[in-house]
């Protein structure tokens, strides 16, 4: 469930709810969290999402919780299967705290958000 709005700088911002009840071990029905706020842009007919400039200082190039593989990547502590990304990964940025990891591939061309 995403909320989209136009901010005072004219940016289109998306914040999404990431539900957690489908993950193993969660027993409460209200588990989840909000995503990192993303600026949404249309570039060459494709929608991109990238963290707003106010939180970009939190982005990293690597993370011990993410294992890169030849066919994509796997997020540790996630009960999901490996993510298969078809195409060359030119740029990979990661933001993580104790509850969520968000992976931005190729400047926000693809985004993967996982509760940990």
Named regions from a protein language model:
Residues 1-116:
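Beta-rich accessory regions
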């Amino acid at each position: 469930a995403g909320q989209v709005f136009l901010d005072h700088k004219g940016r289109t911002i998306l914040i999404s709810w990431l539900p957690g009840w489908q993950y193993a071990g969660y027993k409460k029905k209200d588990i989840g969290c909000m995503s990192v706020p993303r600026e949404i842009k249309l570039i060459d007919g494709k929608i991109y999402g990238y963290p707003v400039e106010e939180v970009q200082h939190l982005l990293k190039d690597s993370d011990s919780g993410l294992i890169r593989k030849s066919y994509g990547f796997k997020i540790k502590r996630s009960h999901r299967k490996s993510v298969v990304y078809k195409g060359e990964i030119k740029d990979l940025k990661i933001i993580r705290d104790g509850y969520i990891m968000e992976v931005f591939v190729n400047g926000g061309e693809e985004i993967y958000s996982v509760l940990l």
